[in-house]
């Protein structure tokens, strides 16, 4: 974090196929070793599979999945008088989106399907139905915040 001035946010250009910033951002999250075209192929393939399996708009299902995974509160560690407390704090909207995408990617990577496209498609479909590991991760985060609600007055 620079001290002098705030660093401007980079503008993410919409993806070429769906003309959506969300998809472009997700492709960037999926990218490994700077291989953007590979990441885009995986994301587009997964979205096609989602459309095939659900017989409806893949983009809508993807948005619903992201919304279901997006957390509202998280806990941050705060030292107060020698003790470390897990203080629940509300999450900024851009961080909510970033966390949701990261959790979706990580849960897809942990699955056992053959290709990454299959894994991602399955995870997106489950997340859209409020199931799956990514949704479980959000629930866990909310549970932690709820359990530590007593320390909310330590917020900074």
From Swiss-Prot:
SUPFAM superfamilies: Ribosomal protein S7 (SSF47973). This is Small ribosomal subunit protein uS7. InterPro entries: Ribosomal_uS7, Ribosomal_uS7_bac/org-type, Ribosomal_uS7_CS, Ribosomal_uS7_dom, Ribosomal_uS7_dom_sf. It holds the Pfam family Ribosomal_S7. NCBIfam families: rpsG_bact. It comes from Acidithiobacillus ferrooxidans (strain ATCC 23270 / DSM 14882 / CIP 104768 / NCIMB 8455). GO terms for biological process: translation. GO terms for molecular function: rRNA binding; structural constituent of ribosome; tRNA binding. The keyword rRNA-binding applies. Keywords: Ribonucleoprotein, Ribosomal protein, RNA-binding, rRNA-binding, tRNA-binding. Belongs to the universal ribosomal protein uS7 family.
């Amino acid at each position: 974090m620079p001290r002098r001035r705030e660093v401007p946010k980079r503008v993410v250009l919409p993806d070429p196929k769906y003309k959506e910033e969300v998809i472009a951002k997700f492709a960037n999250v999926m990218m490994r070793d700077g291989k953007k075209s590979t990441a885009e192929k995986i994301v587009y393939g997964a979205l096609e599979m989602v459309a095939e399996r659900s017989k409806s708009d893949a983009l809508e299902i993807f948005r619903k999945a992201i919304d279901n995974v997006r957390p509202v509160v998280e806990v941050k560690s705060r030292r107060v008088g020698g003790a470390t407390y897990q203080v629940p704090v509300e999450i900024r909207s851009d961080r909510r989106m970033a966390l949701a995408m990261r959790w979706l990617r990580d849960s897809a990577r942990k699955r056992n399907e053959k290709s990454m496209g299959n894994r991602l498609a399955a995870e997106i479909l489950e997340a859209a139905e409020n199931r799956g590991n990514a949704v479980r991760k959000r629930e866990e985060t909310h549970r932690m915040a709820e359990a530590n609600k007593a320390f909310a007055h330590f917020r900074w």
